[in-house]
């Protein structure tokens, strides 16, 4: 998976190709891949994937298909499988503490899915908070920018239309640098960080 990121591959496309066995991928294939990527990342079994795919993406699959997709997913990303197996062993030994990449602790973790979720989503949250801190520190560079909303991994900033390009660059730098500090804390890995910044008249239009 790290190799795919480093080479600039789109993970949803890569997963879809693995699941379907086809090079040419359509819109429905990407929906399937998103369900599999986001579902299995946090430890779902075949039944959980079947329910999640239908509820969250409108993707129908049989239990047999869900099991097949699960097997192909971990064949495609063996490093993730090794990490899951390691976390499962730690969980089975009764370890109830887990941490994000920055070292932020979460205690009393009873479910395996929570143990898998926290290092991923928690690390993303740490990166976002660092990005917000950078925006504050650099507010003099872009005084016309007014942050108005943070939702999951999104930051909504208001400004005049003529300042939009400048604000876009300012926001993008902060987001990339904030996450880069979190992901690339050692020389062992070099994870490229990419963000998408859209200019629109409303949050609804940006989607």
Label every PLM stretch briefly.
Residues 1-207:
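Conserved catalytic core of nucleotide polymerization and phosphodiester-bond processing enzymes
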């Amino acid at each position: 998976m790290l190799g795919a990121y480093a080479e600039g591959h789109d993970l949803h496309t890569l997963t879809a190709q693995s699941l379907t066995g086809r090079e040419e991928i359509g819109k429905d294939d990407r929906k399937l891949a998103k369900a599999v990527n986001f579902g299995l990342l946090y430890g779902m079994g075949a039944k959980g994937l079947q329910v999640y795919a239908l509820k969250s993406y409108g993707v129908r699959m049989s239990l047999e298909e869900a099991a097949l997709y699960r097997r192909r997913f971990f064949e495609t990303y063996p490093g993730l499988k090794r990490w899951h197996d390691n976390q499962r062993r730690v969980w089975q030994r009764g370890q109830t503490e887990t941490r994000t990449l920055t070292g932020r602790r979460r205690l009393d973790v009873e479910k395996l899915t929570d143990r898998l979720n926290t290092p991923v989503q928690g690390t993303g949250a740490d990166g976002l908070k660092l990005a917000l801190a950078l925006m504050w520190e650099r507010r003099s560079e872009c005084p016309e920018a007014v942050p108005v909303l943070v939702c999951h991994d999104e930051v909504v900033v208001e400004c005049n239309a003529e300042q939009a390009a400048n604000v876009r660059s300012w926001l993008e730098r902060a987001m990339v640098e904030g996450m880069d500090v979190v992901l690339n804390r050692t020389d062992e890995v070099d994870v490229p960080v990419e963000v998408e910044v859209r200019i629109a008249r409303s949050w609804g239009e940006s989607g």
